[in-house]
Structures are given as structure tokens and as C-alpha cells.
Amino acid sequence: MAEFLICKIASLQEMNIKWEYEIAQSGKDKENWIIWKKQNIEKYKQGYIIPYYGILEGNIICEATAMLHPKVVQNSAGLVDGHTVYLSAFRTIDRFQGKGYFSKLFHFMIDDLRHKGFTKATLGVEPVEEKNKDIYTHYGFTEFIKTGKEYYPDGTVLNVEYYGKTLE
């Protein structure tokens, strides 16, 4: 039940737990996940990101990350600045999907970012990810901003569409 979900900004210890879980689940992408863990811990320490976690019965079941600085966002022009935040890493453990947990975390995150002075949020999605595009549209990300390419540490290249929404 979503009402029992604890929504919070993650601690460094919680980040390490979540990243180790993701690395263990990653399969053939393991090297990318190891690099992403190191990068995200450093970004957190520098104050460039805010990781938001949904915790149920002591377990991290969903997450999202707010990226606050252009240095940590690929194709950052128009996506992140002093009043615009870039959102990424929307993840929910499979067995908890479709039960309202991520929705509760998302609204917690948006409220927190609004209180921090952000007036717009942006995100990126691969055009082939129709389910994710539908979810993002449901959350109000309907303002098309641009397209671009993003690069994984292993050299994988992704086509990405970027969308925004005003934080009201």
C-alpha cells in the first residue's frame, strides 16, 4: 500500500545499498553500472544531484534523481539551469510497479524541488520506449524540447527525446 511508503532524500549509505542492488541486477551491463555508481556518488558529494528514494518496510523499492547542474547532464542546454531541474533514473523494482509507489515518490520529489525554487523540470526518453513516454506524459511532461544522443560508458549510443513541464 502506497500510504506506507517512506519518501525521502537518500543518504550516502542508502545510495551505496541501492547501487549495489542495481549492479547485482545488471547482467551484461555490469561495467556501466559500476561506473555510474562511482559517478553518482561523486555528483552527490558535490551537491550536483539529489537522489529521492521510496522505502517500504525498510527496503528501497523506487527511486528518481534530480540533476541540478549542467556539468552532470548530457546535452544540458535548455535542460538544466538555476530554475530548471533535469530528472532521471526513474526506477521501481518490478514487483512493486503499478501500485502507486512511484507516483507517491514523484509527487514528493516535485514538491521538494518546487520548495527549493525550481520552476521547471525536464527529462529524456528513448523514442522506442513507448511505455515510459506514456508515463511521462501522464506526469505532465508534454513540452517537447529537443532530440539528442546520449552515450553510455561502454560506448553505447542512444537517441533521446527531451520533454519538460512547468512545476505548479
Located regions from the model:
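Conserved beta-strand in the GNAT
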Residues: Y53, N59-P70, Q74-N75, Y86, ...
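Conserved active-site alpha-helix within GNAT-family acetyltransferase domains
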Residues: S103, V128-I145
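Conserved acetyl-CoA-binding loop-helix of GNAT-fold acetyltransferases
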Residues: T92, G98-D111, H138
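Conserved beta-strand-loop-alpha-helix junction that forms the acyl-donor binding cleft
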Residues: L123-K133, E150-D154
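Conserved GNAT acetyl-CoA-binding A-motif
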Residues: L113-V125
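Conserved N-terminal entry element of GNAT/NAT acetyltransferase domains
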Residues: M1-Y21, E168
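Active-site rim helix/loop that mediates acceptor-substrate recognition in acyltransferases
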Residues: K28-L56, T65, K71
